[in-house]
């Protein structure tokens, strides 16, 4: 879709906003992307990976929320509570680092216990380095290796379409 926007004409902007709203209505399955605070240190840097992935998913029409436990100073329990209380969430993606890998796995186990219908995916340094640790015993449905901007859309489409098609390179 290409829309030319004139400086004094906001009808094209409204048309584009309508188009995006229609896409959002089509995508009933909400995605939450999250990361937990590390136990080892505290910084005020935002997780750009979550922001990039959110932008890519929203461009494809997904309703995405970021719950950044690290930047928001949220406890693991608060992150878990927000996820479990969201009745629209269908997919949770967890950004994992060496400093929060074990906590991320524990979060996934607890989500799986209470809301087994939620699809769980993870990415980041931990899953890229040792994906088996994250998918072992069905904790996460998928561990993404490397950059996730392309694969997260394909995986999200796969989960929301309940497809039995094969995902390339998985």
Predicted regions and their residues:
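A short, glycine/small-residue-rich beta-strand->loop->alpha-helix junction that serves as a flexible
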Residues: 38-48, 96-101
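Nucleotide-activated donor-dependent transferases that construct or modify glycoconjugates
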Residues: 29-41
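N-terminal amphipathic/basic-hydrophobic helices that include classical n-h-c signal peptides
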Residues: 1-22
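Glycine-rich beta-alpha loop elements in corrinoid/cobalamin-binding modules
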Residues: 56-170
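Short catalytic helix/loop segments, enriched in acidic residues and glycine
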Residues: 49-57
